[in-house]
A protein has these predicted regions:
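Short secondary-structure boundary/hinge segments and terminal tails
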Residues: 82, 119, 175, 216-217
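A generic local structural motif
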Residues: 127-131, 192, 216-219
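Ferredoxin-type iron-sulfur electron-transfer modules and their immediate structural context
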Residues: 1-140, 227
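Beta1-alpha1 glycine-rich phosphate/pyrophosphate-binding loop at the start
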Residues: 2-26, 55-67, 75-78, 105-113, ...
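Short hydrophobic core segments
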Residues: 33, 144, 167, 227-230
Length: 230
């Protein structure tokens, strides 16, 4: 294998994809994921981490993939990201983590996003779920909106022990993940819903059909329902 080039990712053939709305990209299988992870140089001062908005320890999780320790890779990613299956598919890696990859200077960057997706999909298929914090601090926090930023915020707060409730105006949670990105790019039942369920497993409650300012006000949340922050 040419170490300067990415391992090709499997996709639907154009003639096939033109007949359905299923996900176009199949992602890596285990063999391809290990091969791609083996291209990582494990840089001491990893530029890819600086390019990641949530600062995932990319060399650490890629190393675990290389060694076949997918559950451990999931734990590394889970420390920083609540939505790895989503981010592995729709984040603009080419201008973020992969855009900073040293491999990309004289060749092709490591396919960090595809590896993140592989780990997330493997975790879902093998029943690996995020660990709920053993204790909460008793402090209630409300998050307005269940789009990617709201879900991420809620997940991070839950990991720190806060009692978090997300209030969503629409019928289904997910925001742009549910209502904006097409199925062939981001499957709803197979990817988005399981990711939302994983956030719930951290202890986050989600209330839909709640319009802040109409159904309930911020003052009511804080003065009457005991929320300490919104």
């Amino acid at each position: 294998m040419d170490g300067m080039k990415k391992v090709p990712v499997r996709e639907q053939e154009p003639k096939v994809r033109a007949t359905n709305f299923e996900e176009v990209c199949y992602g890596y299988n285990e063999e391809d994921a290990v091969a791609e992870a083996s291209r990582c140089l494990n840089c001491k001062n990893a530029r890819c981490v600086q390019g990641c908005p949530v600062k995932i320890d990319i060399p650490a999780f890629v190393k675990e993939v290389k060694e076949g320790n997918y559950a451990e890779a999931a734990k590394v990613i889970g420390k920083s990201s609540a939505l790895p299956a989503v981010c592995g598919r729709v984040c603009p890696q080419e201008s973020q983590c992969e855009g900073q990859c040293v491999r990309g200077i004289k060749g092709e960057a490591v396919s960090i996003g595809k590896l993140e997706r592989f780990v997330a999909d493997w975790s879902r298929e093998n029943g690996v779920v995020p660990e709920k914090p053993e204790k909460t601090n008793g402090i209630k926090v409300a998050v307005i909106g269940s789009g990617p930023s709201g879900l991420t915020c809620a997940g991070d707060l839950a990991k720190l022990g806060y009692e978090v409730t997300i209030f969503e105006a629409l019928h289904e949670p997910g925001g742009v993940l549910t209502y904006g990105i097409p199925e062939f790019r981001l499957p709803k039942q197979g990817v988005v819903q399981p990711e939302i369920e994983n956030v719930k497993k951290l202890g986050v409650d989600i209330e839909t059909n709640v319009i802040i300012g109409k159904s309930v006000t911020v003052d009511e949340l804080m003065d009457e329902e005991g929320y300490k922050a919104v």
